[in-house]
Amino acid sequence: MPMNNFLDEFNLFDSIITMMKNDPCCVEDYEPIVENLNRIFQRTFNDEEHRKSMANSQLFWERLRDTLEAMLLPASLNENSSIPYTRTVRGLILMMRNLAAENQEIPQKLLLQNLVIRGFLHATSEYVVDTPLIKHLYIACLTCLFNIQQNYSTVDMTTFPALLQFLQYPYGIKLEDGEEEEHFWLPYLFLFKTYLNNDEFSNEFFRDNDTPQKDYYCVRDRIFFDIVTAKFIQDQENSFLIEKGRNYLDDSKLEITSIDLSVLECISKSLTTASFGKYLNGLEERQPGKFTTLLQILQLVVTSKEDWNTYELTAIMSWCYPILQRLACKDIPAFFNKSCNDYAPSVAIQLHSTLLSCLDIISDLCKFNHVRKFLISYDSVKILVSLLDTFQKNLLRINFLKGNGDTVNEIKITDHEGNKIEDRLLIFNRVNTNESFIRADNFPHCKLVIIEILASLVYAHPEIQDQIRELGGLALILSNCVIDDNDPFIKERSIVCLKFLLKNNAKNQEYVKKMEAQDVVQDDALSKAGFEISVEKGGKVRLVSKEEDPGNENSEIISIDED
C-alpha cells in the first residue's frame, strides 16, 4: 500500500518524535497528539481493511517502533506532563495491540515485545511521576504482548532481567474486581506460561544461585508464588484448611475458574522444569509455610493429570523423591527422637503435610512403569520399609469405638504390640480425645500410602518380593492387617500387598506360615489375600492358594513344611 495511505499516522508519529526532542514537559503539546492518537486508534477498531493494511506493512511497524523508542528518552517529567505522557505511550501500545491481532510475524521479527516491556519500565522509572494510569498502561502492555505472541513465541534472553522486572510489577497492586481483573489475569498468565514453555527461560528462572543477594530469590518468589500461585490460593481459600491439628488441601471444596485453570497450567509447566527442584528446596528454606502450600498444589496438579510423558515423570521424581528421602532418613527419625516438649506443634504439621504430599504424588505416579523403575533403581524399597518401620515403632494405633450412629463411645489407644498407652502427655500430643480426631504428630494416612507404593513395586516382581522380606517389610505388612483409624483402610491395602508378596514365592509363604504358627497372622487376612492354612495327614502344614485344590495331587501347591 502506498505511503500516503498512512499519511495521518506518519504525521502523528513525526509530531510525537518532535515533541519529545523539543520539550516533553509541555502539557499543551500533548493535547493535539492525544486527540489524533485517539482518532487513529479508533480507526484500527472500526476499519478492518485499513487495520490489515497497517498490520501487513513492515514500514508501518518500523515507524511505530521508532516513535515508541523516541518516547523513552531519559527526560524527567513533572506531575502534570506525566499523565499525558503515559496516555500517549498507552495509545501507541494499544495501536500495536490491535495490529498484532492481524499480524504477529512482523512485530516478533522486530522484537517489539522487548520494546513494549522497555516502554512500561520507562514509564515506571524515576523519569516519570507515578499516576493511576500506570496500572492501565500495564494491562495494555499485557494484552499487546498477548497478541504479539499468541501464534509465534520468541524469548530474547538478553532482556531477562527486564522481563523479571516487568513480571513482578503486579506484586502489591490492587486490582478492581470484575472487568479490570479479568483483563489483567488471563493475558498475564498466558504470557508467563509462554515464557515457561521456553526451556532457556524456565531453567534460568528457577535456577539456583550461590549469591547471597536476597533480591535474586525475592523477585522469583514474588512472580511465581506471591502473584501467580497466590491467585489460586486466594480464589480457593476455603479449600486450604488448617484444622484438627493438620494442614491440608480439601479438593472437594475446589471451585476452579478459568483463571485458576490458567494458574494450574503455569504450575504444571513449572514442575517439569529441570531446575525446579532447586527452586523448591530454596523456597522451603526461605519460606517453609509457602513451601508446604505449594507442595499441596503440586500434589493436586500431578495427581489430576493422566498423560505425563517419560521426560516429565523424570523431572517430577527428580524433586519429589529427594524430599521423601530426606524426610524418611533424617527429619522424621529426628522428630521421634525428641521429647514431646522439644518441638512446636507446627513442626509436626509441616512434616506431616510435606510427607503426605510426596507420598501421594509417588503413589499416584506408580501407575507408570517408568516411575516404578525409577523408584527401584534408586533403592526406594529400602527407604520405604525403613520409614514404615519407624512409623510402626512410634505411631499409636487408634480405634474410635462407636455405638449407634457416629458418636464415639470409647477410644482404644495402643502401641504396635497392642499394649495400652497410659502416657497422658503422649496421648494429648497425638489425639484430641474430646473431639475424636488425630493430630499430625501421629502422621495419619502415611503408613497406608507407603504400603500402597510397596504393593505397586512388588507386583509381579520376585526380586522386590525377596527384598521386602529380607528388610523386614513382610512382617511389617502382616502387622498392619488390622483396623486402625490412624490409617483408614490400611488393613485392606496391606492384604493386597500381602497377596502380591506371597504369589509364587515359597520363601515368603514359608515366612508367613511360621508367623501364623505364632498367632501373629490373622486368618482372615490370609484368606482375603487368597491363601489359607492346610493341615494334612501327619500334621504337616501347608500354606496354599485358595485358587488351588489341596486335594488334587497334581495341583502346584508349594509345600512349606518345616523339616
Swiss-Prot record:
Specify where the region named Disordered lies, as residue ranges.
Answer: 544-563
Q: Where in the cell is it found?
A: Cytoplasm
Q: Which UniProt keywords apply?
A: Cell cycle, Cell division, Cytoplasm, Phosphoprotein
| Cellular component aspect of the GO annotation | cytoplasm; cytosol; nucleus
The biological processes this protein is annotated with in GO are:
cell division; regulation of cytokinesis
Tell me which residues bear Phosphoserine: 559
Pfam families, per database record: Atx10homo_assoc (PF09759)
Q: What InterPro entries does UniProt report for this protein, alphabetically?
A: ARM-like, ARM-type_fold, Ataxin-10/CTR86_families, Ataxin-10_domain
| Source species, domain of life | Eukaryota
Q: Which residues carry this modification: Phosphothreonine?
A: 433
Another remark in the UniProt entry says: Present with 8970 molecules/cell in log phase SD medium.
> What job does the chain carry out?
May play a role in the regulation of cytokinesis.
Its family remark reads:
Belongs to the ataxin-10 family.
This protein's name: Ataxin-10 homolog
Which organism is the protein's source?
Answer: Saccharomyces cerevisiae (strain ATCC 204508 / S288c)
